Design a protein with these regions (language model features):
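Hydrophobic alpha-helix position signal
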Residues: 171, 238-239, 303
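Nucleotide-sugar donor-binding/catalytic module of glycosyltransferases
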Residues: 1-227
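General helical secondary-structure elements
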Residues: 55, 70, 160, 248, ...
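Catalytic core of nucleotide-sugar-dependent glycosyltransferases
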Residues: 204-212, 218-245, 259, 263-286
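Membrane-interface aromatic/basic loop that binds lipid-linked glycans or pyrophosphate carriers
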Residues: 112, 266-324
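TPR repeat positional signature
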Residues: 253-258
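All-alpha amphipathic helical-bundle segments outside canonical DNA-binding/catalytic cores
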Residues: 244-252
């Protein structure tokens, strides 16, 4: 019998999307699953909908808890999970029928510690593009170092917690930082560092739903600096543990700083704006001279020598359009 996979779904006020998410998980071709719906203090009826699913399907368990945020909900799910493997799906996303099967087969055949699939981004209010769903045909086997290199250079391997299947052992002693945004970043590093190898599949089995109210689409506020802090810590950890990837870590850090910097639109955050610009100036030379760096990062580094105003003007006009 296939081993038990625990699928952890944090739920907070996502009632309009929850049926789509849960139905896609209960319809998996891989049958030996437990679905942990972690109700993080919902008030829109999501909590009752979770209970309805638990009453209808023995594979569903519901954890009701006080609101503590995404990290706290994920941690509660990890603590309660009974499976040998863990997977995470956000409550407004959904997956293909072969999502877990493809991830598990790749992991098993590769002898990997975790596997990752690609995703299809879906924007609120826009039609969903049809993506063929199929069983696994091929996958890549990545060493720990190559996996980390791709994360840092953003070459198809994401830091996001969803889209992956993990051996439970990777989470022994690892939990998400409570009260912080962009909590995926530090955990992605810790589990990758513990893994001997990973399997990466090209199937786009995960549908990542972008709502207008999502963190990524929110206007700048100082809490978004959590992303910069996480990426700085990531860079320092990589330089300590994998010095051969130092340039890659600097590239990731500069990309992150630019992403947050150019979200700032008003004068009340001028001090933050100036501090982030100093970070760009500090790392731009190394990124510019790194032939493996993303084109976006090298473009930002090169433009920065023309001054902040020009760099920002080009960014706002193009969003580095067409560059990778």
């Amino acid at each position: 019998m296939d081993p038990l996979v625990s699928i952890i779904v944090p739920v907070y006020n996502v009632k309009p999307y929850l049926n789509r998410c849960v139905d896609s998980l209960l319809g998996q071709s891989y049958q030996n699953i437990e679905l942990l719906l972690v109700d993080d203090g919902s008030t829109d009826g999501s909590e009752a909908l979770c209970d309805e699913y638990a009453a209808q399907d023995v594979r569903v368990r519901v954890l009701h808890k006080k609101n503590g945020g995404l990290s706290d909900a994920r941690n509660a799910g990890v603590d309660a999970a009974k499976g040998e493997y863990l997977s995470f799906v956000d409550g407004d996303d959904w997956v293909s029928p072969y999502y877990i099967e493809n991830l598990y087969r790749a992991l098993e055949q590769a002898g990997a510690d975790f596997s990752a699939s690609c995703f299809e981004e879906v924007f609120e209010g826009q039609p969903v593009q049809s993506v063929p769903t199929e069983r696994l045909e091929a996958f890549e086997i990545l060493s720990r170092e190559e996996c980390l290199r791709r994360i840092l250079y953003q070459e198809g391997m994401e830091v996001t917690t969803p889209t992956k299947l993990y051996k439970r052992a990777l989470f022994e002693g690892v939990r998400y930082p409570v009260g912080k945004l962009y909590e995926d970043i530090p955990v992605a590093y810790e589990v990758t560092k513990r893994a001997h190898k990973a399997a990466h599949i090209a199937n786009r089995d995960y549908y990542y739903f972008q709502r207008g109210s999502s963190i990524q689409n929110m206007a700048f506020n100082p809490r978004k600096l959590d992303s910069v802090r996480h990426c700085y810590a990531l860079m320092e950890n990589v330089k300590r543990d994998f010095p051969q990837l130092s340039r890659a870590a600097e590239c990731r850090y500069l990309s992150n700083v630019c992403n947050i910097l150019f979200q700032i639109r008003d004068k009340q955050h001028e001090k933050i704006e100036k501090a982030l610009w100093q970070e760009v100036k500090k790392y731009r030379r190394n990124v510019l001279l790194d032939p493996q760096a993303r084109k976006k990062a090298r473009l930002a580094a090169a433009l920065s020598y023309s001054g902040y105003a020009m760099t920002r003007r080009v960014y706002e006009k193009t969003q580095w359009r067409g560059k990778k």
